[in-house]
Structures are given as structure tokens and as C-alpha cells.
Regions:
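Bacterial Sec-dependent N-terminal signal peptides
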Residues: 1-21
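Acidic/polar surface patches and capping/hinge elements
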Residues: 20-646
Length: 646
């Protein structure tokens, strides 16, 4: 047996040398994270699932790597009991060719776990070929499934780690084997956004699924999407992973959990922010203000808007320490009329010592570009994957030094990747658990439902004017008004007289061809309001509060700040370029070249948060409380890592 292990080790060593030549600029951890990120784009699963997968893959690679470097830290899974599941480990006799064995163990751990997870996914055919091709490309046998790691079998060790983590995943009942389905029946019937108003809603404080299939059948399939994306739409009334509060976290503990009950059902809620504002309560005014702000900002999504704004770091800085608490602070933090928030602009680039140059752009291009750049919906890396990709790009920057938390010696590429992937993916996993546990319990309404419901009620500003209703939309000159005599929206038979109208992005009815058409902003009946999104994915299939984008992004930004030892991107500036009429997919645009700029990781995260308001997906309450949860998650993760790593 020992002889066979020696032969296998020599064989793998030769292939390790070949693979190192092929992937000379990338570590084993990097090549496997790369292939997983590309698999996300081919998959129809949600951000919660991908955050968990990235974390489990990162933990598998970390535990495999640590076998060869026991002085570097403690195992996360191996030899420990996690949430009642025992990860037995009998020790490992490391081969003499340590580097090649390490490469093999990491590769088998990552590949086998991906294979086990994707075997039940609808995207199996689309993704598995890439996993298998990579294994063969680096000279490893994808069909070698032994988990016997005795006598220094590096491949068996990797397989063992992967299979134990997969078994652990089954034990926590995430739903790996049945599509992650969990019962959470909506209290409201579906809203068809192609039909005016929202008369069918029963509870305006609660989530309402959307039904866009009929509209797609009328309008035609979105040519920018793939055929398999259509299957996602057919299940749009299913709340995505409402059971995620039951999933085992990375760094959070029972001290972070609140046990809540609603409708006879018990919920585990992590980092509970408390309830959002509800209509029919003392927080009526806050409810109306939050959703009305979304409608107000929607009017900015027009390239013909003459407003120019400076989006350089000298004009827009991070919001750390500035987040509002009271309703009055919310109103001061957000610019209801013009968009944006208060922040702490950067006086100068701390790396170069020079001031940041202004970056004037059309507001209507900026808002549309960030709404699409950060959307991270179908056929993208998803929000967790977007931040993992950003971490990789930071690491690739020639100006970046791989010093853990900015201190000590420069780490080799593999150690940096192993550590940083676990740190970031762990925090993203906890962000997903926190955000979705909150979403499931509070089950909060989305703007499209609230805005249309209030418009059906009428106006709440003046009891002497037509259509007065205490729970209607407020009248705001130039933003929300009544359709009066001689208004073209009134209709030939004046059927719409005194209905509410909003100055807003006009919606997908004005876009027949995304390559040539721009809906623009204008006066529309409020009952027809749409968010600035694809008509086929108008709003995500789960509750709004809190924003997943805000939670993911702030958690990621704070972790990246900690592990790099600096809040700043390498060189003190990161830019993302978009060419004229060569980026937007919801409609034509941008109308001019535009460059997004961020000095700090937190600025990028804050922009993500605002993109969801301009995109019509979240009101401020979803955003701000999500940011706060993200901050807490990051802090918990960083403290945990300090004990895990040596």
C-alpha cells in the first residue's frame, strides 16, 4: 500500500509541476475560486446559496492548506464539532513533496465539494463541465473519489474534507438535495405590474410576490437574457430561502440570535434591527416618506436630465459613523429632492498626497449605471461574488502588498488567498444569514407594492382636494401631483381625472429595443409605477427589509478594510469605466462615457446601497438598517479571525 501511495505521489508531483507552469500566476485557491465565480453566472440560485457555497469552499481549502502549515492557525472544521456535527480527523502523514501534495489536497477539496453541491442544481450541465475541465487541465483525475487519506494520500484528504462538509450541509437542512425550497406562503396575492394599481393587496406592510409571465408573453423574451433564465421567473412567487436563519453561521453565536414568533411560526433572527415603519401605526409618516423617496429618486433615471453631479472622492466619501437613527436624522441624511446622502468627502489622496480631481457626470447616466452595475442579478457574480471578484482585483493590483491586516511580512500568494477568501466569504455568509433571517421574519413590503397601493388610495396632503385619503401619496409639486383637466394623462374620456401622477422613470412600456430605446423620465400615472429594472425581473422574489445588497456590501467593505490594513483601494483610487451606449441592458446607455470612482472600500459599498434606491428596489429604511447589520457582521467576523489565525 505504501508503494502505491509513493507512485501516486510521484505521479501527482509531475502533474503539479505542469500545472504550475500553466497557472504560474495563480494559486490553487485562486484557480478554484475563479471557476466557482464563473459557475455563479451560469446558475439560477440566489445570493444566500452562493454565499454559503463560497464560504464552504473557502473553509475546505483552508482546512486542506492548514494540514501542511499547522503553525498558521486552527482548523475551522477538521477535528472539531460544529453545531453538533463531528468532523472526525485522524491526523495526516504529510508526503515529502509538500508543495505538490498541498496543491492536490486543495484542488480535490474544492472540486469535490463543487461537484457534490452542483449535482442537484438545474445548472449542473452548464457548470460541471468547467469544473471537470479544470481538474483535467491541472492533471488531476476528477473521477478519483477515494476518501482514504491514510499514508499521506493528498487526493483522499481533499475528498474527505469535501464530503464531510457536504454531509454537514445536509445535516443543517439548508436544502442542498431539494432545491433549497422552504414553505413561507405570502399573505398577499401576486401583483401583476403590467396591470395598473394594486387593488389585490391584503396587507400593505407585508411582502407581495410579482407575476410578470403574462407581460413577458405579451412583450417578448428579453434578448439580453438566456433561455434558462425563464425558468427562474416561473417560480417568482416563491420566497427565496426564508429558512436561512436556521443555517449554521461562520462567526456569529447564539448571543446574536433573537427567537421571534409570527403567525404561529418561530424564527431565528440574527442581529435583529427591530421593525421597519408600518402603515396603520404611529409610524405612518415614516412609511410614506420612505417609499415616496424611492418614487422621487426614480425621476432621476433620465440621460436628458440636465443635472450634472460630481462623483469623485472629493465630493462623495464614506458614510462610516454617519448613519441615521431617528426619523429626523433619516430626513437629514438623504437628499429627497436631488438624490444622494451626506458623507465624509476625501480632502486628498493619502497615497499620492494630491487632491482628487472632480468628476462631473450626468446624474441620469450615473444613477442608471450604478443601478445596473451593482444589480448583481441573473447571469452575474451575485452580490457576494461581486465582492469576492473585487477582492481578487485588489490583490492583483501591482501596488498591493499581501500583508495580513497591513502588518508583518508579505504573505505568499497562496496563504493570502486562503486567508482572505475565508475571511470575506465567512462574513458574506453571515451577512446572508442575518439579512434573510430578518427578511423572513419581518416580511416587509417592496416599493412597487407600497407606491401603487398608496396611489390607489389617493392623496394624503389636502382634505379639501380630490381623492383625499390619509394613507395616500403626499402631493409634492414637480414630483407627485393630481392629473387635472387638460392633462394628457387624463385620457380621452377623462377616466383618469384626479388620479395621482408621478414624475418618474417611465417604465418598460417605453422600451421596445434595449439597444436603441430610452424610456426617460416623465409624468406617469402612479398606478403604473415600475422600478428601474429588467421587466422580466422587476423586483427580487423575497421581502425587502433589510437590503441584502447593503448588508453584503458593507460587511465586505469593512472586512476588506481590516484584512488589507487600509480603508483605501491600492493607490488611493479605484475606477470602473463604462463606454457610451455600451453597458446598460435595461435600455440604451449611458449617453456618455462615465467613470465610477471610489477612494475607499466603504465608498463602493455605500454606492451599492444607493443604487438599490435609485433602482426602485429598496426604501431608505431597508438600506440603512442593512448597512448597520453589515457593520456588525464584519466586526464579529474580524474578531473571530483573530482567534482562528496565528
Amino acid at each position: 500500500m505504501r508503494f502505491l501511495i509513493i507512485i501516486l505521489t510521484v505521479f501527482l508531483s509531475n502533474h503539479y509541476v505542469a500545472s504550475q507552469k500553466l497557472y504560474k500566476d495563480k494559486s490553487a485557491a485562486r484557480i478554484w475560486m475563479d471557476v466557482y465565480l464563473e459557475a455563479i453566472k451560469k446558475d439560477g440560485l440566489g445570493p444566500t446559496i452562493h454565499a454559503r457555497n463560497m464560504f464552504h469552499i473557502s473553509a475546505a481549502m483552508y482546512d486542506a492548506w492548514l494540514i501542511y502549515h499547522p503553525e498558521k492557525g486552527e482548523h475551522y472544521y477538521l477535528g472539531k464539532t460544529n453545531n453538533g456535527f463531528e468532523f472526525e480527523f485522524d491526523g495526516f502523514d504529510c508526503p515529502t513533496n509538500k508543495d505538490s501534495a498541498e496543491f492536490v489536497s486543495i484542488s480535490f477539496a474544492a472540486f469535490r465539494l463543487m461537484e457534490l453541491r452542483f449535482q442537484n442544481y438545474s445548472s449542473k450541465v452548464r457548470a460541471m463541465d468547467d469544473f471537470i475541465f479544470l481538474m483535467e487541465d491541472i492533471g488531476l483525475d476528477p473521477y478519483y473519489r477515494s476518501t482514504d487519506y491514510s499514508d499521506g494520500n493528498a487526493a483522499g484528504l481533499g475528498n474527505y474534507i469535501a464530503e464531510k462538509i457536504f454531509e454537514f450541509g445536509l445535516a443543517e437542512q439548508a436544502g442542498d438535495e431539494d432545491g433549497y425550497e422552504a414553505p413561507l406562503d405570502p399573505v398577499n396575492p401576486s401583483l401583476r405590474p403590467d396591470i395598473p394599481g394594486n387593488r389585490r393587496i391584503v396587507e400593505p406592510n407585508r411582502w407581495q410576490p410579482l407575476s410578470v409571465v403574462d407581460y413577458i408573453n405579451q412583450k417578448g423574451w428579453d434578448s439580453t437574457l438566456r433561455d434558462w433564465n425563464y425558468q427562474l421567473i416561473l417560480a417568482e412567487d416563491v420566497f427565496l430561502t426564508p429558512h436561512w436563519g436556521q443555517i449554521t453561521p461562520f462567526a456569529m453565536t447564539t448571543d446574536d440570535v433573537s427567537l421571534m414568533k409570527r403567525d404561529g411560526q418561530e424564527f431565528k433572527v440574527y442581529n435583529d434591527p427591530g421593525p421597519p415603519p408600518y402603515i396603520n401605526t404611529s409610524s405612518d409618516e415614516q412609511y410614506v416618506w420612505n417609499h415616496t423617496l424611492v418614487a422621487s429618486w426614480s425621476g432621476h433615471n433620465d440621460p436628458n436630465d440636465q443635472n450634472m453631479i460630481d462623483i469623485s472622492p472629493s465630493a462623495i466619501g464614506p458614510t462610516s459613523g454617519l448613519l441615521p437613527e431617528s426619523f429626523e436624522e433619516y430626513k437629514a441624511f438623504f437628499d429627497f429632492q436631488n438624490g444622494g446622502t451626506i458623507s465624509k468627502p476625501n480632502r486628498r489622496n493619502p497615497i499620492t498626497g494630491k487632491s482628487y480631481a472632480s468628476n462631473l457626470v450626468k446624474r441620469g447616466d450615473y444613477t442608471r449605471v450604478i443601478a445596473e452595475y451593482w444589480v448583481d442579478a441573473v447571469n452575474t457574480y451575485s452580490p457576494p461574488g461581486h465582492w469576492m471578484k473585487m477582492l481578487q482585483e485588489v490583490t492583483d493590483d501591482a501596488r498591493f502588498e499581501r500583508k495580513w491586516m497591513g502588518k508583518g511580512k508579505v504573505l505568499d500568494q497562496l496563504e493570502w488567498d486562503i486567508r482572505s477568501y475565508l475571511a470575506l466569504s465567512g462574513a458574506l455568509h453571515d451577512a446572508a444569514i442575518s439579512a434573510w433571517s430578518i427578511k423572513a421574519y419581518y416580511d416587509y413590503v417592496r416599493p412597487i407594492s407600497a407606491i401603487r397601493w398608496m396611489s390607489d388610495n389617493g392623496q394624503s396632503s389636502d382634505s379639501l382636494k380630490p381623492r383625499y385619503h390619509e394613507q395616500g401619496l403626499p402631493l409634492i409639486p414637480g414630483k407627485i401631483e393630481l392629473a387635472r383637466e387638460n392633462d394628457p394623462l387624463v385620457g380621452e374620456n377623462k377616466e383618469n381625472i384626479n388620479k395621482l401622477k408621478i414624475y418618474s422613470w417611465r417604465g418598460p412600456d417605453y422600451v421596445d429595443d434595449v439597444e436603441t430605446d430610452v424610456a426617460g423620465s416623465g409624468w406617469i400615472l402612479a398606478e403604473n409605477w415600475w422600478p428601474y429594472q429588467r421587466y422580466s425581473f422587476a423586483t427580487p422574489p423575497f421581502a425587502g427589509y433589510v437590503s441584502g445588497h447593503s448588508t453584503f456590501s458593507v460587511a465586505a467593505a469593512e472586512v476588506m478594510t481590516a484584512i488589507t490594513g487600509s480603508p483605501y483601494f491600492p493607490g488611493g483610487l479605484r475606477e470602473q469605466h463604462f463606454n457610451k451606449n455600451d453597458f446598460l441592458e435595461f435600455e440604451k446607455g449611458p449617453s456618455e462615457d462615465i467613470v465610477l470612482q471610489w477612494a475607499t472600500y466603504r465608498e463602493a459599498a455605500d454606492e451599492t446601497c444607493l443604487s438599490r434606491i435609485w433602482g426602485g428596489i429598496h426604501p431608505p429604511i431597508d438600506d440603512i438598517e442593512g448597512r448597520k447589520v453589515g457593520e456588525r457582521v464584519a466586526k464579529q467576523s474580524i474578531l473571530f479571525l483573530q482567534d482562528l489565525f496565528r
